[in-house]
């Protein structure tokens, strides 16, 4: 049955990552309009209407929201989408979002590092760099290895680890070529295990929290998978709740998601390396729903449209789960042709859902970024989860012609 266009929601994004948000919004009665530059985005076909436009252009998004006369705007799984969303909502007086200035404090890496230092939250020692002179000063202030990254990009784009000044200068030029800002951030490398922590804030308190263990494959700065329950202990997770609430109090954050990526050091200290107030990508919000039973996509849409989410239950992970992105292995070269994706017999019984979008005959342009799809697995024990996760890139493989 078609939804009435009287209750219209603009969603900034239309990739596979936004599909759970589109479906959740529609289940809440919204007529969903998606936008974005990518005409091949898999999410657009799920929407009630699509208007192709650049969601990173906040004034274009404001004009689109006005012309469509929408009653709500939701961010897709991208920081540019989030910043445009909060800008539009601030201009139109729509609910569910922080101010544009507050959002910059969280989503621009240099501003967040300064905030964390002010609040006593562990964060990598970092310098904001404008120009080569400041870059040289940063190198003298920091201990190698260092990480060089744009302040405004996610998904591992433009991030490099440098072991010496020569590598650092190459990394600096690449980061500068990618950013839309006039500066980048340079920070000390933190040694430890990588994790995610996703919280739902209600009145400045963590009302729900979920944690995972991250996996990386060929691209060391792009998450290729996550499993749960997290290996982080109760004390570490309690610190993350406390840090989240410190940030919420300081910035007067509205109710809704606060998502964190952190490195846990050997002593259990969680060092926050990325933070955002928009849904994580690659169907992570569906992963949370599978693992806890909490309808995370629906809760996110409710929060972003100004509805009450105080009824959310703080449910722990139920069982042993993996969300795995099917990516190209070391035996596959750029320009290879996809033939199939295969799954070993021993994991067939663990598969809960397969969402494959690759097509036989398509070309893999960049092996470090190419994804054939996403698969959700459930395991019978913690040991099975860890064993099969460690071998998953061999158990689920892209086959090329």
What are these regions (language model features)?
Residues 163-164, 199, 326-330, 375-381:
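Short beta-strand-to-loop capping motifs
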């Amino acid at each position: 049955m078609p939804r009435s266009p009287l209750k219209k929601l603009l969603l900034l994004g239309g990739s596979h990552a936004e599909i759970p948000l589109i479906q959740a919004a529609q289940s809440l009665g919204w007529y969903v309009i998606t936008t974005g530059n990518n005409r091949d985005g898999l999410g657009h076909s799920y929407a009630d209407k699509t208007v192709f436009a650049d969601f990173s252009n906040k004034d274009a998004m404001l004009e689109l929201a006005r012309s469509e006369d929408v009653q709500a705007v939701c961010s897709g799984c991208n920081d540019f989408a989030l910043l445009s969303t909060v800008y539009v909502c601030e201009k139109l007086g729509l609910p569910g979002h922080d101010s544009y200035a507050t959002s910059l404090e969280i989503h621009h890496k240099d501003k967040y590092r300064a905030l964390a230092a002010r609040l006593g939250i562990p964060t990598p020692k970092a310098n904001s760099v404008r120009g080569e002179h400041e870059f040289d000063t940063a190198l003298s202030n920091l201990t190698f290895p260092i990480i060089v990254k744009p302040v405004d990009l996610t998904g591992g784009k433009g991030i490099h680890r440098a072991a010496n000044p020569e590598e650092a200068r190459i990394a600096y030029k690449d980061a500068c070529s990618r950013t839309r800002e006039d500066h980048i951030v340079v920070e000390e490398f933190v040694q430890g295990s990588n994790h995610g922590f996703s919280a739902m804030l209600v009145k400045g308190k963590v009302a729900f929290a979920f944690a995972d263990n991250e996996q990386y494959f060929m691209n060391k700065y792009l998450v290729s998978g996550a499993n749960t329950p997290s290996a982080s202990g109760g004390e570490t997770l309690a610190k993350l709740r406390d840090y989240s609430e410190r940030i919420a109090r300081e910035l007067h954050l509205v109710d809704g998601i606060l998502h964190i990526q952190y490195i846990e050091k050997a002593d259990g200290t969680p060092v926050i390396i990325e933070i955002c107030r928009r849904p994580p990508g690659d169907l992570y919000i569906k992963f949370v729903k599978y693992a806890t039973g909490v309808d995370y996509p629906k809760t996110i849409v409710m929060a972003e449209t100004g509805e009450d989410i105080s009824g959310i239950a703080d449910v722990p992970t139920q069982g042993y789960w993996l969300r795995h992105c099917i990516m190209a292995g070391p035996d596959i070269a750029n320009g290879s042709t996809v033939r199939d994706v295969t799954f070993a017999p021993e994991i067939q019984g663990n598969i809960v859902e397969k969402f494959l979008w690759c097509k036989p005959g398509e070309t893999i342009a960049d092996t470090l970024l190419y994804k054939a799809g996403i698969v959700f697995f459930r395991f019978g024990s913690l040991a099975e989860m860890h064993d099969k996760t460690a071998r998953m890139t061999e158990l689920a493989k892209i086959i090329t012609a």
